[in-house]
């Protein structure tokens, strides 16, 4: 099939690239969230805003927890095996996963308020805490992805890619 955008598809055969692809989605969603408050002040809530909120909610309620599980159950243990010096960073990232979940809960509440009252203005501080926390998190995590690319044998990456794919089939 022709790729009009000259982008290669990423599969679980390349699990680190798949993790990067998830991060690209997070960055896109965080970009939307960075603009949400000012958009609502200027233009108010409309169907486009509600659709974006539904997409963002779907991602952070379903895909993000799976992504964190991919890292915690598969990638991080393997990285520790081949690059034990990353342990303190992994510990920090796992703690951040819980913090991100907690901030997401607060943001999800803000979304619920907006969906129930279209004139509601979500708390800008909650939006900013969420996007700022993810920006810091992604940077630290991607440093470990690069170490993983250099340290983890291809066969092991293939194995965790299969585990990640299987997790989504259940």
Question: Which stretches of residues belong to each language-model region?
Answer:
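Small-residue-biased structural context
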Residues: 1-170
């Amino acid at each position: 099939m022709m790729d009009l955008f000259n982008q290669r598809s990423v599969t679980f055969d390349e699990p680190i690239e798949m993790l990067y692809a998830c991060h690209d989605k997070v960055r896109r969603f965080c970009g939307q969230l960075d603009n949400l408050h000012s958009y609502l002040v200027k233009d108010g809530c409309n169907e486009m805003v509600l659709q974006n909120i539904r997409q963002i909610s779907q991602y952070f309620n379903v895909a993000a927890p799976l992504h964190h599980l991919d890292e915690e159950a598969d990638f991080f243990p393997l990285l520790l095996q081949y690059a034990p010096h990353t342990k303190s960073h992994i510990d920090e990232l796992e703690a951040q996963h819980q913090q991100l979940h907690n901030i997401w809960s607060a943001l999800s509440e803000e979304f619920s308020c907006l969906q129930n009252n279209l004139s509601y203005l979500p708390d800008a501080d909650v939006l900013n805490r969420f996007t700022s926390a993810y920006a810091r998190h992604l940077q630290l995590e991607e440093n470990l992805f690069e170490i993983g690319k250099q340290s983890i044998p291809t066969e092991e990456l293939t194995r965790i890619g299969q585990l990640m794919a299987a997790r989504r089939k259940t």
